[in-house]
Structures are given as C-alpha cells and as structure tokens.
Amino acid sequence: MRKSGCTVCSRSIGWVGLAVNTVLMVMKAFVGLIGGSQAMLADAMYSLKDMLNALMVVIGTTISSKPLDAEHPYGHGKVEFILSMVVSVVFIGLTGYLLVHAVQILLDESMHRTPHLIVLWAALVSVGVNVAMYFYSRCVAIETNSPIIKTMAKHHHGDATASGAVALGIIGAHYLNMPWIDPAVALWETIDLLLLGKVVFMDAYRGLMDHTAGEAVQNRIVDTAERVPGVRGVIHLRARYVGQDIWADMIIGVDPEHTVEQAHDICEAVQAAVCGKMRRIESLHVSAEAREAGDTSKPTFSEEPLTYDEVMLSKVDN
C-alpha cells in the first residue's frame, strides 16, 4: 500500500462502518416512525444493508487475509465474493417485499401524510455522513482492491443519494402540498435497492468465476516486462483474478546465446519489475525461451486457470 495509514484504515473500516451504520439505521427508523415518513423508513433499510455489509467486511477481510495452505493454494480471497453474494441475495428479497408495500401505500390516498420536518434534518445528517463514508471506503477499496469494500463504497454512495431524495420529498410535501411524494420516494428507493442488489450479485458472480485480469492489466504486465534489459518480448501471458489479487505466469524471449543462469537472472528481474509496479500481483511465475533477434511476434494470452503444481511453483519462484 502506498501509505502506512492505508493498512490501519483497511483493518478498521469494517468496524467504523458497522458503528456508523448502526447509529444511522436506528436514527432513521426512529425518525421515520415518529415523523410519519415512509421514505425515511425505506431509507433505514439502506443503513441496515450497510450495517450487514460492514459486518461482512469484518468477517471477510479477516478470513481472506489468512496465508496459503495445502488445502487452499489460491488463498482465501473468494470468501469476500461469497459474502457479497449473500448480502445481495438477502436484500433483493427484503426490498422486493418493501416494493410491494410502497406501491400499496402510494395507491391508497387515505394513507398519504405530510411527514414532520424532523425527517428533513435527519435526511440531511444522513447525506453528510454517507458522503464522508463514501470517500473513506472508496479510498480503502482502491488501495486494497477488495470487492466487499468496493461494495461498501457503492452502498454509501447510494445511501447519500437516497437520503437526498428523502429531503427533497419532505420539502415537496410541506411547501408544495404534495403528500404523495413521500411514498413515491419510498417506491423509488426500493427499486434502487433492487438494482443495486443485482449489480452486487453480478460482481460477486464474476469474481467467483475467476475472470481474466483484462486487456488493460495484461498490457501493463507485458509493457513492464519488455522494458527489462535482456528481454526479447513476451511470448505468452496468462493472468487472472483470484479474489482481489492477480495470479499470472508468463514466458519471455531471451538471446539463444545466454546461459541458463543468465536467463534465470533476467526472469528474476522481470518478476521484480512487474511486482514492483503493480500492487495486486500475488503470484507471478516467469520462464524463458530462446528467441532470435528481430522476432516481433506479439504475445499470446490465455484465460485457462493455473494447475495446482503451477500455483505452488509460482509461489516458490515469486
């Protein structure tokens, strides 16, 4: 990580999020009940969602940080994707119920009420807190590349937007004499929660499928390797995400006149260069093949996973 404080933040963000969102959830539920706001009650679900997500961060980061062992040669990084999927499924179910309830209230004019102004102030407090938590969790997510902390940042962004909508709804209900706005905002919030749950679910699904590192990452690895003295281009590269980390192996071209020791030294230099430039490389195995000068063939890429033996070999070499 770039700064020493990043490690502290990555370890504490789950507990901070858990405390903050518990307070916000209680405040929103209490104010929504006494203030008569369906939108604020729906907004409390955002904080409940975030509270559970923060709990998943605490559990997930603890498990995923465990070292490799014989039974888990790829590490424990996938646990974060599993927990993200659990959170998304739970809230898709809960918000489906809330969606039906919001529609019923919106269609029944006898249930339309103008909420108390205390709801407006609670919504503004929620906006401020969630904006601060969004930037905090986004910073940690960038540094750690953790999928569950990325989910946490997305949730805080959505919460700030939802609380802002609640505030606008209260203003409209009070000053424009439109009490139906409050249940309408509640309806919008439940739809937004459903869509957010779908995004989180699909992100977790892709993570569990060990997707390729992507063209941009592959090109960075190739570019870095080819800048190392003695490298006559990258012949083959295989890179994919395992959890939040990248596992890769590559074949580089070297002068046919080089000795085995010289080729090995070049491979080690490539490892050091790539791992030094790219922060999320967990494992990189580099081997060399003879390549004639002037051979400008482009590298080939593979998305097939590494075998168990290759994984253990790369951990020894890296």
From Swiss-Prot:
The chain crosses the membrane at residues 13-33, 39-59, 81-101, 117-137. This is Magnetosome protein MamM. NCBIfam families: CDF (TIGR01297), CDF_MamM (NF033615). This bacteria makes up to 20 cubo-octahedral magnetosomes of about 45 nm in diameter which contain membrane-bound crystals of magnetite (Fe(3)O(4)). Residues 1-210 are annotated as: Transmembrane domain (TMD). Belongs to the cation diffusion facilitator (CDF) transporter (TC 2.A.4) family. Residues 211-318 are annotated as: C-terminal domain (CTD). InterPro entries: Cation_efflux (IPR002524), Cation_efflux_CTD (IPR027470), Cation_efflux_CTD_sf (IPR036837), Cation_efflux_TMD_sf (IPR027469), CDF_Transporter (IPR050291), Magnetosome_CDF-Related (IPR053502). PANTHER family: MITOCHONDRIAL METAL TRANSPORTER 1-RELATED. One of its GO terms (molecular function) is monoatomic cation transmembrane transporter activity. The keyword Cell membrane applies. The keyword Nuclease does not apply.
